[in-house]
Amino acid sequence: MNLQEFKQKYNYDVATKMMQQYLDIKFAHLDCLLLFRMGDFYEMFYEDAILASNVLGIALTKRGKNGEEEIAMCGVPYHALENYLTKLIEENYKVAICDQLETPEEAKNRGGYKAVVTRDVTRIITPGTIIEENLIASAEPNYLASLVITKNKETASLCYVDLSTSEIFVVNVPEAEILNELARLKPREILLSENLRSSNLADSIFKQLNFRITYQVDSFFAINKCEKIILDFYKMKDIKGIGEISSSQICAIGSILEYLSLTQKQNIPHLPIPRIINFHSYMTIDFATRRNLEIVTNSQGTLKGSLLNTLNHTVTKQGGRLLYNFLSSPLTNIAKINHRLNITEFFYSNLEIVKRIRELLKKTSDIERCLTRITMNRSSGRDLLSIKYTLEAATIIKGVFFDAYGFNLPDFIEKIIKPLSGDAELYNLIDESIREDAPNNLNDGGIIKHEYHPKVAQLHDLINNGKLHIEKLKDQYCKETGIDSLKISHNNVIGLFIDITAKNVNKILDPKFIHRQTTVNSVRYTTTELQKLESELANAKTLVISLEKELYADICNQVIEKASYLRMLASSLSGLDVFCNFAYIADEYDYVKPEFTDDLSFDIVKGRHPVVEKALKRESKSFVYNDCHLSEFERIWLITGPNMAGKSTFLRQNAIIAIIAQIGSFVPAKSAKIGVVDKIFSRIGAADDLIRGQSTFMAEMLETSAILAQSTKNSLIILDEVGRGTSTYDGVSIAWSVLEYIHDKLKCRCLFATHYHELTVMSNFLPALQNYTIAIEESGKDILFLHNIISGAADRSYGIHVAALAGLPASVINRAEQILLKFEKTSTGKGKNILSTESNNLSLFNLEPNKTTISSKLDEQFRTIAPDKLSPKEALELIYELKKLV
């Protein structure tokens, strides 16, 4: 819609001046919901009002007419804005905040009584640019990302920033890993070129990851423009000042800085030079695996029951965010992993220190986000007080270390606590200037201590003791005139005045007494002193608020000068919180320090699933631990056994142990020896993907295909029931070929759970594959799941027993047992007519051997396969050939 069409639609020419102002601003922000400040309310008009009233559940009313058209209107109180913004941001709306830039009095002085108050948009709030504490999750980052695809389309550059903490990063990502990297970061908003709107990438980001995409015109990412933006922002002459970065990284960084400038109206906090991330320095965990393992959220997207929720006993918000980042990005460098483990071990060996530090950390605040609000002029006195309390607690924490160790601390601990020495100058500045009861709103006044500035003290004295000052002046005039009955009074017409009776008028001789009014019984005067006092009393509140704002701004500028130190302090405190947390959970839940190797070891003794164990503990139940011994020579465990026996839990727990170990934490086991895992892939369970029109089987095959394409020798794969979403013959064939491919081609560690007992024969000719099963105890028709993993293969699935446990009617269970008995007779050559009367879906290995069966054809086909020579594409084509035999 062009400007002319817009004005015509809203009858611009006959609108009031105020409504014309609104329409001018709205046209400049058509993609936003515009909140227009009108006195004590933010109001919305026309379509915005209709939309907002529905989303926010507030009344829709009218604001007169514009021509013949009624103007829809709704509004929210300015002091409750954050509550309503929360709902709008949750619904992914882009919100433009339009504020009054002058008071009505200033507008009147500028342009007369008909002048419209000057207004303009002061910021645009989007999901990726929030800094308000009440609008963002405290225990996780709030990333805005910009994604730029390289010209060869083999890699992408990703810049991501957390505006609330002023952190910015840039990374190059292989094309096949883009979705996995986005899944790691979980950005609230992604900037993408308009040219990619109809691409498969954009479709996957929206449908698979459900992330918000904000499209920008292609020129928004232009290299020359973005380079200039970077140089201007960081006041550099050469882009090399950023480091060794690619053209696409320049575009990603520049576009994100430009977007921040547009949404924050140039009011961007000082961001450090982007930290260049090596993609391969973190374990790759694809989005499906993150969902399956429930690492930072459960399958419903909430915290309860997730690994993060189980491990998170941090006591600070910034510590919680750091733990979130650790779990999202496990390390792959042995030296860095061991460095973290050594820190954890130090605190585990000093639990008394841990206890004291955790209590002191509770007295600190989220100074990262406080500092950002200060630099963006959106802070309150509470933010400064938070910094003060944190500085005080930090010095005490450092004292705890030196009380215990003196100057004999390990270097890696000394490095962490170095910033805890504090900053006496900064502490004293805040302590001497900011009142302990400072309000949240600067306009309320009362933020600066009276003694910090003499003028503040004077103005507050006037506000608090105005009557005493008037009384003092009255006493002075009584003494000067000799009129004991002299009074100082007030009315709304002439304000303060000196009131004497008519008979005493001859005693007023001093010309400083200026006649104002004569009544029947009295004469009224004023003086220059009284007029000055009256003016000061009338303006004291306004003057003190104005002065306090000036002083507050100066104090904030002095705090900003210490920004680098405060960020180091925040990093130190969050690190202490996380490693004390690791020590705490190691002691609380009996975790052990893992050992890392550079081979394919995965030797876990008495491993446990931390989330399940914690849940059982609440019910006073014990978790059944299990060993897992993978190595170069025994890379694949093929696990058979019934449902409910614990196969999936066993698979998940070992993947989780690898993740926990590589973030630098102790692990739930008696011992753990692990060769570093570069990638973890999990295919456990699937639901029909109705949004993308994919069945369970298609979803499973897509996930399995991605695993086979992206895994390396150092990866860990956990697969559960591959092939179960199709017929028995297809399923066994697919599972068989997948196992062969992992064994012969990938040669990586793998836990493979299945109901296809026919696969267990593969251990006869795949030397690195071993059979394991779940121990069962039978008593008549009853079975007991022991949950122990033991060497060997299951001889049957116990499906009917599980059905009985699930509560199926007894008649159904009895009938199922009768049919099973007939099937079992069929497989031994008896009851030959059962196939036609009961089922045609028997196991392919149980059909009659004296006929030319599908099984024999499959056997013949398998004998001609050369697994080492098959590409993934050829393997998939082979699957379709096998299907034709059915």
Swiss-Prot record:
Chain ranges passing through the membrane: none
Residues that hold ATP according to the record: 641-648
GO MF annotations, alphabetized: ATP binding; ATP-dependent DNA damage sensor activity; damaged DNA binding; mismatched DNA binding
Domain of life: Bacteria
UniProt GO BP: mismatch repair
Any single Pfam family the record assigns to this protein: MutS_II
UniProt keywords, alphabetically: ATP-binding, DNA damage, DNA repair, DNA-binding, Nucleotide-binding
Coiled coil: none
Classification via NCBIfam families: mutS1, PRK05399.1
HAMAP family xrefs: MutS
Family: Belongs to the DNA mismatch repair MutS family.
Function, as annotated: This protein is involved in the repair of mismatches in DNA. It is possible that it carries out the mismatch recognition step. This protein has a weak ATPase activity.
Name under which the protein is recorded: DNA mismatch repair protein MutS
Organism: Rickettsia felis (strain ATCC VR-1525 / URRWXCal2)
Highest classification ranks of the organism: Bacteria, Pseudomonadati, Pseudomonadota, Alphaproteobacteria, Rickettsiales
